[in-house]
């Protein structure tokens, strides 16, 4: 083997392996201290890009879960208020039935009306004050809002809430009353047919035909109407006037009356009536109030059902988001996180190689000194 002084190849080789071992140890220490095996693009450019996308998706999923929980909270606040509104309407219905009884005097009906008015005011107060984060929920201003329940744009769910004020059309309907009352001696003669045509809430054209019998009185006619249709409700006031009420929850638009009996009864024009207009100081008003409140209860129940479905949907959405997020983070971990068992093994190897390279380098540096012995 040649002995050189100017070029110590053995030392250079040992130095190269020493540097390589030092770099390996430094990289292992970086991975072990950071917890990530990809700390820069030079470690794994493709893996870093995939990891960043997965991280963005995971953060989006976390925010989507928060949004969904906020949506559930809004629905719970609104439904709680609707529950109390339902209790108020049911109490108003009880009072209407009580006032419709013939055992009550005018003064007693006026007293009942005072409670009905107070309940109506509370119904409106609940509608006006129920809010979430400053947003009114039940006074008609909420409208339709979207809830982002996905990690990407376009993954939104819409929630609509209408007004629960007692003066809205959803809390009432149209009332039709005979222009003239029938006394107790009135009965159906040879004109026995009454037809009612309307469009129901589902958009279907309906025609209700009442076949009365000669000798039937006005109360029996109201019974026939109620027995053949859930969409319209009939009652008779103390003045003998037949009145028909069609809730906006059952009927779209107006009811048209025809048939030879319709002419004899003589229905007047449609009149818009809501819970706000309830007047239980008369038998006729009390009976109509029951029909009006039934429609209002259906309106509230319909909104509550929508909120219940909304909450259930969001609960399932949250479960799905959590499952997706778990798998996304697991994938990201496999790509980016440090395998401590593997990395500690690699660091130990680098440390041993570094120590060995250092020892060999020290010996290699002594090789040129052999030339001095030849000169001696």
UniProtKB/Swiss-Prot annotation:
It comes from the Bacteria. SUPFAM superfamilies: Phase 1 flagellin. Keywords: Bacterial flagellum, Coiled coil, Secreted. Gene3D superfamilies: 3.30.70.2120, f41 fragment of flagellin, N-terminal domain, Flagellar export chaperone, C-terminal domain. It is found in: Secreted; Bacterial flagellum. It holds the Pfam family Flagellin_C. Residues 103-128, 310-338 form a coiled coil. GO terms for cellular component: bacterial-type flagellum; extracellular region. InterPro entries: Flagellin, Flagellin_C, Flagellin_C_sub2, Flagellin_hook_IN_motif, Flagellin_N. Its main location: secreted. One of its GO terms (molecular function) is structural molecule activity. Belongs to the bacterial flagellin family. V.parahaemolyticus possesses two flagellar systems: a single polar flagellum propels the bacterium in liquid (swimming), while multiple lateral (peritrichous) flagella move the bacterium over surfaces (swarming). The polar flagellum is synthesized constitutively but lateral flagella are produced only under conditions in which the polar flagellum is not functional. Heteromer of multiple flagellin subunits including FlaA, FlaB/D, FlaC, FlaE and FlaF. Flagellin is the subunit protein which polymerizes to form the filaments of bacterial flagella. FlaA is not essential for polar flagellar synthesis and swimming motility. Homomer of FlaA is able to form a functional filament. This is Polar flagellin A. It comes from Vibrio parahaemolyticus serotype O3:K6 (strain RIMD 2210633).
């Amino acid at each position: 083997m040649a002995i050189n002084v100017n070029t110590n190849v053995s030392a250079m080789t040992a130095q190269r392996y020493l540097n390589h071992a030092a770099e390996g140890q430094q990289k292992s220490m970086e991975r072990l201290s950071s917890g990530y095996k990809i700390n820069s693009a030079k470690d794994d450019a493709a893996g870093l890009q995939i990891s960043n996308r997965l991280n963005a998706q995971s953060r989006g999923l976390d925010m989507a879960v928060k949004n969904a929980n906020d949506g559930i909270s809004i629905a719970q606040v609104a439904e709680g208020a609707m529950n109390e509104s339902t209790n108020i309407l049911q109490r108003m219905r009880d009072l209407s039935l009580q006032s419709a009884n013939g055992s009550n005097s005018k003064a007693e009906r006026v007293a009942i009306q005072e409670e009905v008015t107070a309940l109506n005011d509370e119904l409106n107060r609940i509608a006006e004050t129920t809010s979430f984060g400053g947003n009114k929920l039940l006074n008609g201003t909420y409208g339709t809002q979207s809830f982002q329940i996905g990690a990407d744009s376009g993954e939104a769910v819409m929630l609509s809430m209408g007004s629960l004020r007692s003066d809205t059309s959803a809390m009432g309907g149209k009332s039709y009353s005979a222009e003239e009352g029938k006394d107790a001696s009135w009965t159906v003669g040879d004109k026995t047919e009454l037809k009612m045509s309307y469009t129901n809430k589902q958009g279907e054209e309906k025609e209700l035909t009442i076949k009365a019998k000669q000798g039937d009185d006005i109360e029996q006619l109201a019974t026939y109407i109620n027995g053949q249709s859930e969409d319209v409700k009939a009652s008779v006031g103390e003045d003998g006037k037949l009145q028909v009420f069609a809730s906006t929850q059952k009927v779209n638009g107006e009811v048209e009356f025809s048939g030879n009996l319709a002419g004899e009864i003589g229905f007047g024009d449609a009149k818009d009536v809501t819970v706000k207009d309830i007047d239980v100081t008369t038998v006729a008003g009390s009976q109509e109030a029951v029909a009006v409140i039934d429609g209002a209860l259906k309106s509230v129940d319909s909104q509550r059902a929508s909120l219940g479905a909304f909450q259930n949907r969001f609960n399932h959405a949250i479960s799905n988001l959590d499952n997706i997020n778990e798998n996304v983070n697991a994938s990201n971990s496999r790509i980016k996180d440090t395998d401590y068992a593997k990395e500690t093994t690699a660091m130990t190897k680098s440390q041993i190689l570094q120590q060995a390279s250092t020892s060999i380098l020290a010996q290699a540096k002594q090789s040129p000194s052999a030339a001095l012995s030849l000169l001696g």
